[in-house]
Design a protein with these regions (language model features):
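Short active-site neighborhood of thiol/selenol oxidoreductases, capturing the structured segment around
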Residues: 4-17
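Thiol-based oxidoreductase modules, predominantly thioredoxin-like and allied folds used
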Residues: 13, 34-54
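The canonical Cys-X-X-Cys-His
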Residues: 18-22, 69
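Typically the conserved alpha-helix immediately C-terminal to a functionally engaged Cys/Sec
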Residues: 22-37
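A short glycine-leucine-enriched loop at secondary-structure breakpoints
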Residues: 59-64
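Non-catalytic, surface beta->alpha helical segment in thiol-disulfide oxidoreductase systems
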Residues: 65-95
Length: 95
């Protein structure tokens, strides 16, 4: 992808107590290829399900496990992955 993806947003749900979330943050979300791919989206929100905003959005999107990553398009449709993903799987999910 060389141009910004039109009207797509990424929501990344996690929690401080979640081991796989911490692992994903330190190994996957810090990867330069992942950062580049995420920069192609209109927005990326990191949401803690134990905080008010994260709790509200996790209920709205029916998040039942963390980490969960959701991509929302301009029509409000979304795709969701609710488990730890390595760098390769995360990049594939973002396509």
């Amino acid at each position: 992808m060389t141009e910004k993806t039109k009207e797509k947003h990424v929501l990344i749900f996690s929690a401080q107590w979640c081991g796989p979330c911490r692992q994903m943050k330190s190994s996957v979300l810090s990867d330069s290829k992942v950062k580049q791919r995420l920069s192609e989206y209109d927005s990326v929100q990191y949401l803690d399900i134990d905080e008010a905003n994260g709790r509200q959005l996790s209920a709205a999107y029916r998040v039942s496990a963390v980490p969960t990553v959701i991509i929302v398009n301009e029509e409000g449709r979304h795709k969701k992955m609710g488990h730890f993903m390595n760098t390769y799987n995360f990049l594939e999910f973002l396509k």
